[in-house]
């Protein structure tokens, strides 16, 4: 890492995060002038107004220009989506437990006096709340399931970066003008053209700023860098990039512009090493220094950490530590089924090894064709201990997409949005994170509904749980579809849609069904606790008959608080096998109930004509979802977290080593979980030391691939180090750890999430 990159890193974290009202004020000012116009045009005009008037900056030593806010890592508001939580939490932002932001007194007053009065009763949240039935609201309130994306842009998508980079904005504008001439009454085409042209002008603003800064710059090298930034910007405003620097610059400009349009998380990067390779090769051919090209890439990696999402306090518990979702996948397969690993795949990992920040959230695609050098480079990067890269298995994901009607060529081109959500770049609007389903809460409801049932059998209880899962999935789908319609009617994204196939051919926004593939992705959470609980309950109550069903319920209601309750808890934990240890009796319960969940979810369609798709990953939601569930027969205390990850065993219950964990997860139908899965594994640093440790990790990754698991990620850190960081956070500001599908700075996480990571079983190989 060069001195420049180190200074750029340091500059991001010198000051506290702040909230900027600039986007919200500009958006509102435009919106007030467009009453009565079609929503999609109002949205486009508001975004164009932002692009014209927002303050821009080029920071010291930057090689990649483009900042969403002048101050680093500032949060922005979108009151047009939901003004209510912002008003409620204005005073809490600087002191809340997770994801703190400073906000000035002046901005508090401006929000209360200007922004909130305008958006009250005219936001997307008002529409969604007005459409939700009481039954759906009750299920959300008790956290049987959550409906996400009701207060901000949807995101969770990958635009067609090859189209942007290989054609350039000038050609795309010309194409959109032709569409407008052919269909002059089509509001989508009008909105998209307006924003493509506004994007060109926004980029030209940076060209003019760079030229102005160069005029007064006393340092000759920096002056030339600014002039090159200006030249690159002027070129990118009209033409397709010719160099790696230009390609990275246009790529980042579009990321920033799309942030202004929707203020959404997980506008992900796709297969970066594939579409950027021609530009990297062109620069090498032109005689560019490879070391400088790596510095360009590292500059871009640093920039990815400048964007953080302002979430509500409750949302920050579900998505703790700013999982921005700048996710990029490396390697994988070509459309012909050959290995896609290239020189840029290696360089992306080299650049990450130098930068070591939470973003981009790199992943590596493994398959039977992966070569040893790239597998070893991957293992070497994992061993650094930041949780990056995560691993995805082509041997599972490609068939999973084929099962959803995706073509073979498209399935081989898959990438990941957000944390682990599977998507086809440039062709999918997957609504990937629309809901989370609390499987353990459903079990708890069923247990209490059977209190006093003297004829209850274990099979009866299983049938009741399956039926209840089906019932609440119906309600979850109802709520998700209302949110889907809310985004269609209140928050279309015409600029983003212009980079998604087949929106241009259909002449409509992604929110209106314009994409080629239309899914709605929902997560089933708590399968490990559910299977552990049912296995122990069956053994204790129905097979051994040590307690009656009602007696066990009483122990659970008392939260194991009595001396007898403590003995029962010890027996539940120690005498009954747990998921994650390669024991069929309990693993098969997980497989059967998770399959039931998946098959129920996939029965339903969304308003865009697409299918609901199941996944199993938690982000950090296993903590808040566990807080609403009482004591359970796996020995969990009331309010204790659920198993992390999605498919991970419960904390401390995976006692037979990491290979046994792989075998347990392999018994689940990973192919059905086409919205993504998540498996966390923690290793001690000592077990991966030296060349031998590296080869053991590489062999473990090959076993993961052969066993046909979908996903795995790693923490490589000592619990003692993490405890020290809790005590002396000022000495560990750069410590990056894996949470669930993303990495974050350990000291920026709340204590409940920190404790969760510390308690995860540390394995040896």
Please tell me what each predicted stretch does.
Residues 203-211, 273-277:
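Extended amphipathic alpha-helical scaffold segments
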Residues 190-201:
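Extended non-globular scaffold/tether segments
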Residues 214-217, 221:
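A conserved hydrophobic secondary-structure block that centers on an alpha-helix together
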Residues 207-210, 214, 230, 531:
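Small-side-chain structural scaffolding
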Residues 2-189, 225-765:
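Conserved catalytic cores of very large enzyme subunits
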């Amino acid at each position: 890492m060069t001195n420049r990159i180190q200074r750029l890193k340091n500059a991001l974290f010198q000051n506290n995060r702040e909230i900027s009202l600039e986007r919200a004020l500009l958006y509102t000012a435009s919106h007030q002038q467009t009453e009565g116009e079609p929503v999609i045009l109002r949205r486009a005009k508001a975004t164009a107004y932002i692009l014209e008037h927002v303050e821009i900056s080029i920071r010291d030593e930057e090689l990649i220009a483009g900042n969403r806010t002048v101050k680093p890592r500032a949060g922005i508001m979108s009151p047009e989506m939901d003004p209510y939580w912002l008003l409620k939490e204005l005073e809490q932002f600087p002191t809340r437990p997770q994801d703190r932001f400073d906000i000035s007194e002046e901005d508090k007053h401006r929000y209360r006096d200007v922004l909130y009065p305008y958006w009250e009763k005219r936001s997307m949240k008002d529409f969604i709340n007005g459409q939700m039935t009481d039954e759906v609201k009750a299920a959300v309130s008790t956290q049987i399931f959550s409906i996400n994306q009701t207060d901000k842009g949807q995101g969770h998508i990958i635009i067609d970066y090859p189209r942007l980079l290989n054609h350039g904005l000038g050609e795309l504008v010309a194409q959109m003008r032709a569409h407008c001439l052919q269909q002059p009454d089509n509001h989508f085409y009008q909105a998209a053209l307006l924003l493509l042209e506004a994007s060109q002008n926004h980029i030209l603003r940076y060209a003019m700023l760079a030229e102005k800064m160069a005029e007064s710059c006393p340092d000759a090298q920096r002056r030339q860098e600014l002039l090159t930034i200006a030249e690159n910007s002027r070129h990118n405003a009209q033409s397709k990039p010719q160099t790696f620097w230009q390609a990275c610059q246009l790529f980042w400009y579009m990321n920033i512009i799309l942030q202004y349009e929707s203020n959404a998380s997980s506008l992900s990067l796709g297969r970066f090493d594939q579409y950027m390779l021609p530009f990297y090769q062109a620069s090498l051919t032109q005689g560019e220094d490879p070391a400088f090209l790596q510095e360009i890439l590292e500059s871009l990696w640093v920039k990815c950490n400048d964007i953080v999402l302002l979430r509500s306090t409750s949302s920050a518990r579900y998505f703790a530590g700013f999982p921005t979702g700048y996710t990029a996948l490396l390697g994988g397969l070509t459309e012909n089924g050959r290995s896609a690993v290239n020189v840029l795949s290696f360089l992306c990992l080299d650049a990450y090894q130098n930068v070591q920040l939470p973003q981009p959230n790199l992943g590596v695609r493994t398959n039977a064709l992966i070569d040893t050098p790239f597998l070893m480079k991957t293992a070497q990067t994992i061993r650094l201990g930041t949780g990056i890269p995560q691993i995805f298995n082509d041997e599972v994901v490609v068939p999973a997409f084929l099962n959803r009607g995706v073509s073979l060529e498209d399935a081989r081109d898959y990438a990941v949005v957000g944390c682990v959500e599977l998507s086809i770049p440039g062709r999918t609007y997957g609504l990937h994170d629309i809901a989370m389903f609390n499987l353990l809460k459903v079990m708890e409801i069923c247990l209490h509904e059977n209190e006093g049932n003297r004829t209850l059998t274990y099979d009866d209880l299983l049938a009741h749980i399956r039926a209840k899962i089906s019932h609440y999935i119906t309600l979850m789908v109802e709520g998700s579809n209302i949110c889907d319609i809310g985004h269609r009617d209140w928050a279309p994204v015409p600029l983003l849609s212009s980079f998604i196939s087949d929106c241009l051919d259909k002449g409509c926004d992604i929110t209106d069904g314009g994409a080629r593939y239309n899914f709605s992705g929902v997560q089933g959470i708590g399968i490990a606790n559910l299977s552990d609980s049912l296995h122990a309950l069956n053994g204790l109550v129905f097979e051994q008959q040590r307690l009656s069903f009602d007696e066990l319920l009483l122990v659970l209601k008392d939260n194991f608080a009595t001396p007898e309750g403590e003995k029962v808890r010890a027996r539940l934990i120690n005498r009954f096998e747990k998921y994650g240890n390669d024991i069929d009796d309990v693993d098969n319960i997980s497989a059967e109930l998770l399959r039931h969940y998946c098959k129920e979810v996939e029965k339903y369609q969304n308003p865009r004509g697409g299918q609901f798709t199941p996944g199993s990953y938690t982000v950090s939601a296993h903590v808040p979802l566990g807080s609403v569930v009482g004591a359970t027969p796996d020995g969990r205390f009331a309010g204790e977290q659920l198993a992390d990850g999605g498919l991970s065993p419960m904390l401390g219950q995976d006692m037979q080593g990491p290979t046994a964990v792989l075998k347990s997860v392999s018994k689940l139908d990973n192919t059905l979980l086409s919205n993504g899965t998540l498996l966390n594994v923690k290793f001690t640093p000592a077990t991966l030391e030296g060349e031998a440790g590296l080869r053991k990790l590489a062999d473990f990754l090959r076993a993961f691939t052969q066993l046909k698991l979908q996903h795995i990620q790693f923490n490589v850190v000592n619990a003692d180090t993490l405890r020290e960081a809790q005590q002396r956070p000022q000495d560990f500001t750069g410590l990056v750890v894996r949470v669930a599908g993303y990495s974050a700075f350990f000291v920026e996480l709340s204590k409940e999430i920190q404790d969760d990571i510390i308690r995860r079983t540390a394995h040896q190989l």
